[in-house]
Curated annotation (Swiss-Prot):
Keyword Magnesium: no
Record's keyword terms, sorted: Electron transport, Membrane, Mitochondrion, Mitochondrion inner membrane, NAD, Respiratory chain, Translocase, Transmembrane, Transmembrane helix, Transport, Ubiquinone
The protein's name: NADH-ubiquinone oxidoreductase chain 5
Role of this protein: Core subunit of the mitochondrial membrane respiratory chain NADH dehydrogenase (Complex I) that is believed to belong to the minimal assembly required for catalysis. Complex I functions in the transfer of electrons from NADH to the respiratory chain. The immediate electron acceptor for the enzyme is believed to be ubiquinone.
Lineage: superkingdom: Eukaryota
InterPro entries: NADHpl_OxRdtase_5_subgr (IPR018393), ND/Mrp_TM (IPR001750), NU5C-like (IPR003945), Proton_antipo_N (IPR001516)
E.C. designation(s): 7.1.1.2
Gene Ontology CC, one term: mitochondrial inner membrane
GO BP annotations, alphabetical order: ATP synthesis coupled electron transport; electron transport coupled proton transport
TM annotation in the entry: 1-21, 30-50, 81-103, 120-140, 177-197, 200-220, 241-261, 274-294, 301-319, 331-351, 365-385, 403-423, 452-472, 511-531, 610-630, 631-651
Lineage: Eukaryota, Fungi, Dikarya, Ascomycota, Pezizomycotina
Example of a GO MF term: NADH dehydrogenase (ubiquinone) activity
Length: 653
């Protein structure tokens, strides 16, 4: 049953990709979707069997690498962390498959699309279930390649080509550091198996652990779109909307967070890595929230919202609250997938226009889309009793409950980020559904409310976004829970803060995020309704224009990368390639070797002058040299060097 969970999506991908012409569009949709649904049902069963009953399971298929002390198996490990990650990955993937049947119904390449979706899901399952870093790295590379294929699905569009290449190359930076971290692990621990590495970690030097942790953190930064390696995330919106929901809700962007959670027995011994995670997540949260407030593309706003929530998860990891990071990851997967698919329903209904300034007044035309986006937004801003409330607010409380200066500052920074999250959520809802119509008349005449394949996944995800957090909060973050008793997480005793967060936090700081959320929601709607002209007038002033340009252009980070880093690297690479090519081909390679042999033969040939005295001189020199060889013990290499020097000297003369 466990191997069926892993390999059934791969089988669906192969059938749809290689035999798509034989089975047709409906056959590809039916086979891939049914295989993913079966896999999801088995994963839910395993969630109860492995997670609730605390019965971890390891499956070793065959020996992959056997070289002296390095022994790496192709094996899979199912524990509470694995089955918890499989739940959002497979539920969202199955709903995206169903949604895509309706959303991509007019696309001529359905077989290829569903093959890519299933292959993406398979690679994510490999990443999550691997029992060693090398197999997990295979999954990381696999989801990177599949994301390139999916973002570039409409490969005739130049923007899709550029975005997919940007995403691929940005992730290669993180993968490079992840590879370096794996090399250090092999060199220091002698293996890449989780159990071996985590068992030996307490006995190693902290500098080694810090170096490995930083490499793993940079690898996670690329996959989970943390500041510095975040530029690919909004550009990946060029792919179809179901792809955006799959990549940015439950799969690729969570891979980096999962890597850090899985490596908790390693990074817990390095306070440097934990403090880096704490501040990296805080800066990412407020940075992405500010940028999201000034975007006009509905999918890009949701993408920056994803980046902000990933920053929250990294904050939780920096606080050593790994179960809290996992709980927020699972909750976030459901309501963020709901946001993306709801945005896709709106885009699908208004002639594929993504600028929400050209929407307005869609509430009477799309009541279901309005309802589900309202539910998802309420969960995103952590309104009480929605799923996001039980995890997001607890992360903020944990930051304040650690009672260190860094964590206290991070609490206020993340709270400000949550305030901006509220503002852009209200902005999207207001400009899309509530304000006066701003789009072409044809968009409203031809509004399509979607079919059962589009609406059913939205309803299911809305139910998860409302109830999942409440139903599972005691399982994931309850003080008496035994869900993680199999020790998949390791928290150093000096980093344990759950009790302080639960009992020592002032009520004011528990209610502060909720107060800001409600207040800013009211202020945002009132300001847009009654004082909108003031904002427009300020925007046309020099100060307002400069502020808006800075935030709308994403703090000019892409401009800096393109003009100062990318160009420099390209020039340096060009010069290096030129020098190495000249050195390897013209001096040492085939051309250089041929040239040197020809020169040597000419030097030897020039000794034949036709003059008797010259030949007599050669004979005399050779005789003297031979006599000396009888009495001197000279290495043969030195003799060859002397002969080469003599021939070179003669040639110069």
């Amino acid at each position: 049953m466990y191997l069926v969970i892993i390999f059934l999506p791969l089988l669906g991908s192969i059938i749809s990709g290689f035999f798509g012409r034989k089975i047709g569009v409906q056959g590809a949709q039916l086979i891939t979707s049914s295989f993913i649904i079966i896999t999801t049902m088995l994963a839910i069963f395993n969630f109860f069997e492995v997670g609730y009953n605390n019965i971890p399971l390891e499956i070793n298929l065959f020996r992959w690498i056997d070289s002296e002390s390095i022994n790496i198996l192709w094996g899979f490990y199912f524990d509470s962390l694995t089955v918890s990650m499989l739940i959002p990955v497979l539920i969202v993937s199955s709903l995206v498959h169903i949604y895509s049947i309706g959303y991509m119904s007019h696309d001529p390449h359905n077989q290829r699309f569903f093959s890519y979706l299933s292959l993406f899901t398979f690679m994510m399952i490999i990443l999550v279930t691997a029992n060693n870093y090398l197999l997990m790295f295979l999954g990381v590379e696999g989801v990177g390649v599949c994301s390139y294929l999916l973002v570039n699905f409409w490969f005739t569009r130049i923007a899709a080509n550029q975005s997919s290449i940007s995403a691929f190359l940005t992730n290669r930076v993180g993968d490079c550091f992840l590879t370096i971290g794996m090399f250090i692990i092999i060199w220091s621990f002698g293996n890449l198996d989780y159990s071996t590495v985590f068992s030996l970690a307490p006995y190693f030097n902290q500098e080694f652990i810090t170096l490995i942790g930083i490499c793993l953190l940079i690898g996670a930064m690329a996959k989970s779109s943390q500041i510095g390696l975040h530029v690919w995330l909004p550009q990946a919106m060029e792919g179809p909307t179901p792809v955006s929901a799959l990549i940015h809700a439950a799969t690729m962007v969570t891979a980096g967070v999962y890597l850090l959670m899985r490596s908790s027995p390693l990074i817990e011994y390095s306070s440097t890595v934990l403090i880096l995670c704490l501040w990296l997540g805080a800066i990412t949260t407020i940075f992405s929230s500010i940028i999201g407030l000034f975007q006009q593309d509905i999918k890009k706003v949701i993408a920056y919202s994803t980046m902000s929530q990933l920053g929250m998860m990294v904050i939780a990891i920096g606080l050593s609250s790994y179960n809290l990071a996992l709980f927020h990851l699972v909750n976030h997967a459901f309501y963020k997938a709901l946001l993306f698919l709801g945005a896709g329903a709106v885009i699908h209904s208004v002639s594929d226009n993504q600028d929400f300034r050209k929407y307005g007044g869609l509430k009477p035309f799309l009541p279901l889309a309005y309802s589900i986006m309202l539910i998802a937004s309420l969960s995103l801003v952590a309104i009480p009793f929605m799923s996001g409330f039980y995890s997001k607010d607890f992360i903020l409380e944990s930051a304040y409950g650690q009672f260190y200066i860094s964590s206290t500052l991070v609490y206020f920074i993340a709270t400000i980020g949550a305030m901006f999250t509220t503002l852009y959520s209200v902005k999207v809802l207001y400009l899309t559904f509530l304000t006066n119509p701003n789009g072409p008349l044809n968009n409203y005449k031809n509004v399509d409310q979607g079919n059962i394949f589009i609406n059913l996944p939205l309803i299911i995800l809305a139910i998860f976004s409302i109830f999942f957090g409440y139903l599972t909060k005691d399982v994931f973050i309850g003080l008496g829970t035994s869900f993680f008793i199999d020790n998949r997480y390791f928290i150093h005793p000096s980093h344990e803060i759950m009790l302080d967060t639960e009992f020592a936090l002032p009520t004011l700081f528990k209610l502060l995020p909720l107060f800001f959320t409600i207040t800013l929601s009211i202020i945002g709607i009132m300001f847009s309704e009654f004082f909108g002209n003031l904002l427009i007038k300020f925007k046309f002033t020099n100060l307002g224009y400069n502020i808006f340009s800075l935030f709308n252009q994403r703090f000019l980070i892409e401009f800096f990368y393109n003009n100062y880093i990318t160009n420099f690297v390209l020039k340096l690479g060009g010069q290096t390639t030129k020098v190495l090519y000249k050195g390897s081909v013209e001096l040492l390679g085939p051309y250089g070797l041929e040239k040197r042999l020809l020169n040597l033969s000419k030097n030897i040939g020039s000794l034949s002058t036709g003059v008797i005295t010259s030949y007599a001189l050669y004979i005399l020199i050779g005789l003297i040299f031979y006599v000396f060889l009888l009495y001197l013990n000279i290495d043969n290499n030195i003799l060859l060097l002397l002969l080469f020097g003599i021939f070179s000297t003669i040639n110069k003369k």
